Swiss-Prot record:
The keyword Nucleus applies. It is found in: Nucleus. The lineage of its organism: Eukaryota, Metazoa, Chordata, Craniata, Vertebrata. This is Homeobox protein vent1. Residues 16-26, 44-55, 114-128 have a biased composition (Basic and acidic residues). Keywords: Developmental protein, DNA-binding, Homeobox, Nucleus. The gene is vent1. One of its GO terms (molecular function) is sequence-specific DNA binding. It comes from the Eukaryota. Residues 16-129 are annotated as: Disordered. Pfam families: Homeodomain.
């Protein structure tokens, strides 16, 4: 048997011979570092400081060289298309570009919503603001019908609408508004007819002891009794002269009348 050497030169020579056939192993291929992942979008992505023209051109040329080397490696190694696709997509879609697209799409949506709202709002406003202008002849006829009957039936409403050249809905709304107006007028009249409350001064009656006792207003005025109910006797203070007679009669007897005959 022929002894084969295991030196590095022999191994590399074998790999070079096997490379054109396309049957080289993964272990013999050179190591390619992974591309860095793109940064998350931030508000400072748009504010990238500019450098001088010479530096920018140098960076562009170095980037082109690195991209060409990566393409050559891609053809030699078919297991790297996903890596290059991810790096290419990260180069094409920058964070600043994604933010710009998001703001533009949101602005377009808001503008479309505003235009739709404006296109719909004038129609609704016109429908709400449309009010029928009744002629004096129509108003007099409607007032006469309202004085006769405040609630119209379907047949009567139809006849009145055809005679006045109006729709049934217009006649119905007019009668509703007229009933509300009459209700407000009645409420105003009731408030005006109620007299304001009168506050009477508080009176006092002086008894022999010299202490004033207030008299309630109920002692001067009593409501009439119900015919089917017995009148309730309210407390009425006795007149002053009655108390004076009682006090004079009591003073005729001495305080120690029984003690003299003991």
């Amino acid at each position: 048997m022929v002894q084969q050497g295991f030196s590095i030169d022999l191994i590399l020579a074998r790999n070079r011979e096997e490379a054109p056939d396309g049957k080289d192993s993964v272990s013999s291929r050179p190591h390619i570092p992974c591309a860095p992942q793109p940064l998350a979008p931030t508000k400072y992505a748009k504010e990238i400081p500019r450098r001088k023209d010479g530096q920018e051109q140098g960076e562009i040329t170095s980037f082109q060289c690195s991209s060409e080397e990566a393409r050559n490696r891609q053809f030699s190694n078919p297991s790297l298309p996903a890596l290059h696709r991810s790096s290419g997509s990260s180069d094409e879609f920058s964070p600043a570009g994604s933010e710009d697209d998001g703001t533009e799409s949101s602005g377009r949506n808001s503008q479309e919503n505003d235009t739709e709202h404006r296109s719909k709002s004038p129609k609704s406003d016109l429908q709400r603001r449309l009010r029928t202008a009744f002629t004096p002849q129509q108003i007099t006829r409607l007032e006469q019908a309202f004085n006769k009957q405040r609630y119209l039936g379907a047949s009567e409403r139809k006849k009145l609408a055809t005679s006045l050249q109006l729709s049934e809905i217009q006649v119905k709304t007019w009668f509703q508004n007229r009933r509300m107006k009459l209700k407000r007028q009645i409420q105003d009249q009731q408030h005006s007819m109620v007299p304001p409350p009168v506050c009477y001064p508080q009176t006092f009656s002086y008894y022999p002891g010299g202490f004033p006792v207030p008299l309630n207003s109920g002692s001067f005025y009593q409501p009439p009794a119900h015919p089917f109910q017995a009148p309730q006797h309210s407390f009425i203070p006795q007149p002053l002269h009655h108390h004076m007679r009682m006090s004079a009669h009591q003073e005729q007897f001495p305080p120690l009348f029984g003690a003299q005959y003991m």
